[in-house]
C-alpha cells in the first residue's frame, strides 16, 4: 500500500510538473496549446518573485515495496485580487494521473490550496473547469464550490497572442 504526501513543489520537480501539464492538456483535448518549457517553469516558479506556486502529490511506497517516490498529481496556483473581496487564490491547474484517481488525491490537493489561501488571508479560492468535465465539477461541488456560470452567469474571456498585441498597439 502506497502513501500519498502533498508537498510544495521544488525546482527539481519541474520536469515532472511539465509531464503532468502535458498529460492534463491531452486529457482536456488541448495538447496543442502547451507552449511552456521546463526552463520557463523553473524561472517563473522558483525565481526571486515567483509568478506561481505549486503543490505536488507524491506517492511514497510502503515499507518493503520496491517503487520509490513518484509524483502523480499537482495543483498549480497563484494569487490574484478581487476589488469586491480582496485577496484571492486561483487554482490554474489540478491534475491526478488516471490510475490514481478516485483515491482522494485531488481533494487533498484542493484542501491544501484552501489552507494556503486561508493562511495568506484570501477570501476566495477560484478555478475553472471545461463544461464536459462532469467528474471534476461533481468533485468541486461536493467540496463546497459554487458554479459561478450557473449561479451568477459569469463567462471567462482572454486576450492572447495577436489579439493582445493589437489591443496593446504593439
Curated annotation (Swiss-Prot):
Q: Which SUPFAM superfamilies match?
A: Acyl-CoA N-acyltransferases (Nat) (SSF55729)
GO CC, alphabetical: cytoplasm
Q: Which domain of life is it from?
A: Eukaryota
Q: State the top-level EC class.
A: transferase
Localization annotation: Cytoplasm
Q: What sequence ranges are listed for the domain N-acetyltransferase? A: 4-166
- N6-acetyllysine-modified residues are 29
**Stretches assigned to coiled coil:** none
Residues forming the catalytic site? 140 (proton donor)
Which residues does the annotation say bind substrate? 27-28, 92, 152
Gene Ontology molecular function, alphabetical: N-acetyltransferase activity
Q: Indicate the quaternary assembly.
A: Homodimer.
Name the family. Belongs to the acetyltransferase family.
Name it: Thialysine N-epsilon-acetyltransferase
* Annotated organism of origin: Bos taurus
